[in-house]
Amino acid sequence: MSLETPRTHYTSQIDIEQIGDDKVTVCGWVHEVRDLGGICFVVVRDREGRAQITLVKKKIDKEIFDAARKLVRESIVAVTGTAKAEGKAPNGYEIIPESIVVLNEAESPLPMDTTGKVDAELDTRLDSRFMDLRRERTTAIFKIRHEVLRAVRDFLSKDGYIETCSPKVVATATEGGTSLFPITYFDREAFLNQSPQLFKQILMSGGLDKVFEIGPIFRAEEHDTRRHLNEATSIDIEASFLDHFDVMEVLEDMVAYVYEQVIENEAASLKALDIELSVPKTPFMKVPYSQAIDIVNAESEETVEWGGDLGTVAEHTIGEHVFKETGESHYFITDWPTEIKPFYAMPYEDNPLISKSFDMMHRTMELSSGAQRIHIHDMLKARIESQGLDSDGFDFYLRAFKYGMPPHSGWGIGCERLVMTMLSVENIRDTVLFPRDRKRLSP
């Protein structure tokens, strides 16, 4: 199929002073039709915004006028005409059409409202995601998500990191545990990978020095909360000859840069979401684990023993404490007990009970985990076995530590949680085009 009237502009690109009397063609969805008898207004929507098409009955071809009045909402149209300044119209102009071509007429009634005038439940919107994406707020979230990932790549690439890709079908659990999706790989059992961790460490032995990956991870955890997904997008780095303090600095600087870029490049999307974003101040506050549990025990009804994990109540308590003290939402919890961190986290030499590990937190939830890694083969093998895992199953990983593995550190941060906390989105599923959670496998 070839278009007789190819698009010349997005609706946001039309500049009256530059275009003059030249013809323009916009293509998109019929957002609204207002028939006032002697005048008809058609609002056409595309990815970048809206354009008002103005038809005055006495000044336009009767066939075009009658066709415009009968347009079905959400039909696909191509409109060609002359743009004129009109301060009351979207983007400050209107188009006086010489042709309106219906490229595909929508059925009626629609599965959901796209104007934002009628609210719909999240599951209703996800069931008809193709319609939900036509809502300005939904589009804004995914434009910002795109900018977040673009900024991440830009920041890390400029800092000398090489983008890599690790396999998503693996034979061994990355970090132990049972939260894996088993699959059949020809005649063998395999799993969907829960993290690129082991592979990015192997790359340190290969001499790539500093790497990053943006890709899917899979967790077979039966959470059913607003903060959890079973398929998510993880942003990971690994870097040789850097310790945990070094990579914490990389992480906080990257987060600040991402916020800067979103503010600079997605002002219209932020406006659509009615959000005024500010750049987090660096360096982020560092709260040792021992101090964190003291805060929880003193300021909440929850009690956390040393060596216990931090739940939702604890995270909120610490987050509020930090916010009151600094006015900032981002901070680190450092120096976690070795036994509750993954086997590859490096213990302190003078106190092996504490690891060189950290979580980067937002006021409302955990965003990232990282650590300096164990780079000594025998120590790493012993840690694997101390957690009840079979070291033979990690041979492909351990071999890389026998022949010259440099000291290295790294972290992973969830893209969805980063976007969710940035935009104060209530449910993490709103930050994924087609989310996979405990109950949803389609669309």
Swiss-Prot record:
Annotated site residues (Important for tRNA non-discrimination) in this chain: P90
CDD domains recorded: AsxRS_core, ND_PkAspRS_like_N
Residues binding Mg(2+) 2: E366, S369
Cofactor(s) the record lists: Mg(2+)
Subunit structure comment from the entry: Homodimer.
Known role: Aspartyl-tRNA synthetase with relaxed tRNA specificity since it is able to aspartylate not only its cognate tRNA(Asp) but also tRNA(Asn). Reaction proceeds in two steps: L-aspartate is first activated by ATP to form Asp-AMP and then transferred to the acceptor end of tRNA(Asp/Asn).
Name of the featured protein: Aspartate--tRNA(Asp/Asn) ligase
